[in-house]
Amino acid sequence: MTQRIEVGGLQVAQELYDLVAKEIAPATGVDADGFWTHLGAIVRDLGARNRELLQKRDEIQQAIDKWHLERKGQPHDAAAYKTFLEELGYLQPEGEDFEATTENVDPEIAEVAGPQLVVPINNARFALNAANARWGSLYDALYGSDVLPEDDGAEKGTRYNPVRGKKVMEYAGRVLDEVAPLAQGRHGDVVAYNLVDDNGRKRLQARLSDGSETGLADPEGLAGYNGAEDDPTVLLLRHNGLHVEIQIDREHLIGKDHPAGVKDVVMEAAVTAIMDCEDSVAAVDAEDKTAVYRNWLGLMNGDLETSLEKGGKTIQRRLNADRDYIGADGRALTLPGRSLMLIRNVGHLMTTPAVLDADGNEIPEGILDGMVTSLIALYDLKGLGRYRNSRSGSMYIVKPKMHGPDEVAFAVELFGRIEDALGMERNTLKIGVMDEERRTTVNLKACIREAKERIIFINTGFLDRTGDEMHTSMEAGPMIRKAEMKSSRWLNAYEDWNVDIGLECGLRGRAQIGKGMWTMPDLMKGMMEAKIGHPKAGANCAWVPSPTAATLHAIHYHQVNVAEVQDRLAGQRRATLDDLLTIPLEPSPSWSAEEIQQELDNNCQGILGYVVRWVDQGIGCSKVPDINNVGLMEDRATLRIASQLLANWLHHGICSEEQIMETMKRMAKVVDQQNAGDPNYRPMAADYDGSVAFQAACELVLKGREQPSGYTEPVLHRRRREAKAKFGA
């Protein structure tokens, strides 16, 4: 039974109350009980509006379902459908042209294009690794990944392999040729680097293997250095707004094998990182929410630490310090040692038992997230922490899963109330709008208008957006297979539309226009071939699954000047509303029994592999092996798309409930085997009826049509609490 404190018209779980009163509030100047009083007032004033918006979602969905059912068996009439959506209020007027006016935005968001990490904030090690992924070793990323083949004696092995090391150095040299080309020759031919004076500014000089000397093709590419001018230990380069270090040490195990003594090339990598309270996190009660907020506190005050065992040694992880150099102009130069951190709060749907209102009802979780994470951000805004996160005096909150401009307006109103409660200046709280719901996509310009003074981020997300696409049009007919979605008309239009509308609304120089996640952290060669498409599409950030991926993806932002791409794209609209409203239906399904079973196997295995860790162990994001044992980074978005596709096929008779249950049981055995090495794992196949996780997975599919917008949170939260009560974990 949760112990609660009555304060401010609320009933607050004891552990959360203590966290605020004893750990968060004292240094901020905010009275702890006054904080809860403000929250109570916000809940009373805005709670009903929150519920109205959710009711509106349901009413719109019911109307769309009814429209499709009335035309069942008829060819889809796109023109009539569009008119219906306008009359329904689903499609809203775009309104006049405008430009965002957001101010006090850090350059990492407003000016610099680069990789973005997203990590579950309740995992301290992941959070610290992400915050510290601002800088990453290119040598390590290349040596340990599949970017370089392991043939011709270049195996990774268990200890350093000089043959592989040579290939790493050659690849890194080619990267330097793109980042900071020499006036003559290549970095791979350099045998010594040094610095010379040039009218009061240092200039890089390189001696080549033929004895000739050269400099950078663009001398301004040298930003700074460390060490002696005739024997530097670090050369700091700058290109497309990103920095790269050449680290030199001829005595080093690696450096001694390089002609110029280069022991590493360090990339400025994850310029920004989203600390996630949402889709990658399993936080279902006061205990879980308290852990989430405590880690955010540790990131803001600089005290977060964790330890891990590596090679028989205990390693302490903490936030990295800033990096100091001598600037090329001779003055001291300091660069941030950490990624600029944003935080993703939950959306408008869920409520939380961590705090109850005066009537004993759970309060909206998004309102609680906003208040507590903003209170904690005062450590940064008031300079109370060990390091600064925002140097512009802003806090960056990403809001997910909003449906249309009214819901964005509600979030903006909430932010204003939070600022008033915490004594912040207006528009201190900036907003990132995830474009991952269909009603937001088709009304994106109107959504941005509602947040035009706060907007710092929009992005696309294939997985959630496809889940909503399928749920919205559930009654329209059977959907195409999951793999075919990526080449569908609506999806390509969605990706272009997001960039074009963002540029049209003046986000350039003020906000990020982002692209989605590469979900295969072990397949870096594939990422290097494919993900350059994101900067080429005009996105100034894109999601990566690991610090290694961030280091490698950073290369793409040297190969592509995103600012120039955005210049070319400005003023265009490459997609139309008609494209966006194209429903991804299979009008005449002719799949073979084998193809149908293949789709069932693939999706059931993925659902079970993710849900079993979520429900039984509270792991909201992890590398889950797929049916071919390829590790995929899974979160609730991947679960949403898989469960909604199967729910759609079941509803339209492509498969039967018996087929799904047979597949679920067979795939549970596969997942059990894949997790056999995990001592904390509870097998599902030993007792299907008794496995809470197995039952949760089945419920998500068999009752997928009933889930609000196809979301998985209601089932997952209820089942996770059931598992905690049953197993005590």
From Swiss-Prot:
Pathway: Carbohydrate metabolism; glyoxylate cycle; (S)-malate from isocitrate: step 2/2. GO terms for biological process: glyoxylate catabolic process; glyoxylate cycle; tricarboxylic acid cycle. It is found in: Cytoplasm. InterPro entries: Malate_synth_C_sf (IPR044856), Malate_synth_sf (IPR011076), Malate_synthase_TIM (IPR001465), Malate_synthG (IPR006253), MS_C (IPR048355), MS_N (IPR048356), MS_N_TIM-barrel_dom (IPR046363), MSG_insertion (IPR048357). Acetyl-CoA binds at residues 118, 125-126, 280, 317, 545. Glyoxylate binds at residues 344, 436, 461-464. This is Malate synthase G.
